[in-house]
Amino acid sequence: MFERIAGSPPEDAAEGRNGLRHVTSLSLTKVSDGLIDPKLVLSWLLTALGSPAWVIGALVPIREAGALIPQIALAGWVERMRRRKWMWVAGSAVQGMAALSIAAAGLLLEGLAAGLAICAALAVLALARAACSVSYKDVLGRTVGESRRGAVTGLAGSAASLAVVVFALLLMSGLLQEKGPVLIAITLAGLCWLGAAAIFSTLEETPVEERHESATLPFRKALRDNGLRRFVLVRGLLVSTALAPPYIVLLAASGGDAALKQLGALVLASAAASFLSSYVWGRLSDRSSRLVLALSGAAASGALVIALVLDAGGIMGAGWVAPAVLFGLMIAYHGVRQARSVWLVDYAPDDARASYAAVANTAIGLILLAAGAAGGVLSSMSPSVAVAGFAAMAALGGGLAMTLEDAEAG
C-alpha cells in the first residue's frame, strides 16, 4: 500500500509501516485543525458566547505566533532526545487536552470569562503545536525516504480535508449553527489529537547518538546558512497566501454578498482546495519543491489580481464569484504548505533538522506578525489596497523561489 501512495517502494518494511502511521496520525491532526480553526470556528463560538471583540481578535495571533515563535527554544531540547517522536507524541496529546478544555469552557462559561479561558487554552495548544512542528520534520526525515515524504504529507492533507468538507457543508446548511454541535466538533478534535498521539507512539524510530556539542552550535550553523536565509525570505513573502483570505471576504462583503459571512464558507473553500491539491502538490514537491513554491506564488498572485479586477468591476459580491477566487487562492496556499515543508526537510543536514526548522519557523512567526499588522494598516485605506500588497508579495516570493537550491537534486 505504501508503494502505491508514494510512487516508489520503501527502503525496507519498517519504512512502509512508518509511512502509513505518518499518514494516519497526520490526517487526524489535520482534521482537528479544521474542526477548531481559530479564524472561523473559535471566532464564531466566542461571538455566540458574548465575548468582547478584543478577545476574539486575539485568537489568530495567539494561535499563529504561539505555534511558531517558541520553536527556537524547543529545538535544542528536541535535538538532545534520542527518540524525537516522543516530543511529537507529547505535543499532540497536550493539544488534545487543550481542545477538550476549550469545549468545557464553551459549555460552562460565558462572556469575558469564556473568552479568557478559551484564549488561555488556545495558548497552551499553540505551544504544544510548536513542539510538534519542530520535531516532526526531523522524525519524518529519519523514518521516510527523501523521494516519498511529500506524498505522505500530501495524502494526509487530502484525506483529512474530506472530513472538514463534511463539517463545512453542515455549517453552511445551518444544521450546526447552534453552540452544542460546535462544541461536539471541538471535542472530536481533541479526541483526534489524542488518537494521533497514540498512533505516532508506535513509530519505529532508530535512536540517535547523544550530542555533546554546545546547545547553541546548531543554531549558529543555521543562522550562517545562506540557503536557509534565502528560504526564510521566500517563505516570508509567501505568508501572503495565508493572510489574504480574510481580505477577499471583506471585498465580497463590500460587494453585497452576505452569504460569505456564514461560518462554513471559508472552511469549505480551504478544505475543498486541500482535498483536490495537497496530494498532487506533495508528489510534485518530491520532484522539485522550489518549483512548487514558484508555481504557488504565481497562482496566488494571479488569484489576488483577479479579485482586484472583479472588485473594480463591481461583481465580487455576485453569486459564487468570491468563493471561486478563494478556492483558487487556497489551492496556492496548500502548495506553499506542502513545498515549504519538503524543501526544508530535504535541504537541512540530518543532524540539524530541528534547529533549521526552529530558526525558520521563529522568523516566520515574527514576519507573520509584521505582515499581518501591515495588512491591517493597508486595509484601513481599503481592503483592495491590502489585497494588492499581498499580490505583490506572492509574485515576488514565487519569483525568488526559483533562486533556491534544488534540495531534491542533492
What are these regions (language model features)?
Residues 56, 87, 152, 182-188, ...:
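Alpha-helical transmembrane segments of multi-pass secondary-active solute transporters
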Residues 22, 114-122, 230-231, 317-326:
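Short hydrophobic/alpha-helical segments at membrane-entry points of transmembrane helices
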Residues 21-40, 59-76, 91-95, 121-178, ...:
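Substrate-agnostic recognition of the 12-TM MFS/MFS-like secondary transporter fold
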Residues 48-49, 80-81, 139-143, 251-256, ...:
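Helix-to-coil boundary motifs at intracellular loop junctions of multi-pass secondary transporters
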Residues 79-94, 286-300:
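Cytoplasmic membrane-interface "Motif A"-like loop-to-helix N-cap segments
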Residues 2-69, 227-266:
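Helix-loop boundary and gating motifs at the non-cytosolic
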Residues 93-111, 298-316:
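C-terminal ends and interior cores of transmembrane alpha-helices
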Residues 197-213, 402-410:
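Helix-loop junctions on the cytosolic side of multi-pass membrane transporters
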